[in-house]
Amino acid sequence: MVPRDLVATLLCAMCIVQATMPSLDNYLYIIKRIKLCNDDYKNYCLNNGTCFTVALNNVSLNPFCACHINYVGSRCQFINLITIK
């Protein structure tokens, strides 16, 4: 299952690409540019979340996190109470 924050960030990035380069296969264009964050953001995601960024035209967009199932939030900072039993 893909984290909602990741989906929202990808959709936002796709809107930017569509506005600037409408003739490209936007989905694949974005997916190919997702990279792990560099060391500057090694502690950006909390609770063992994984930090990613999208590089468009040699510019990295804001980092975003893929959270473990028990955490949510833009930086995985909240406990997902729905998954706690």
Curated annotation (Swiss-Prot):
Signal peptide: 1-19
Family matches, as SUPFAM superfamilies: EGF/Laminin
MF terms in GO: growth factor activity
Gene expressing this chain: MGF
Glycosylated position list: 48, 58
UniProt main location, coarse: secreted
Name by which UniProt lists this protein: Growth factor
Function: Stimulates the growth of some tissues.
Keywords from the named record: Disulfide bond, EGF-like domain, Glycoprotein, Growth factor, Secreted, Signal
Classification lineage: Viruses, Varidnaviria, Bamfordvirae, Nucleocytoviricota, Pokkesviricetes
Cellular component annotations (GO), alphabetically ordered: extracellular region
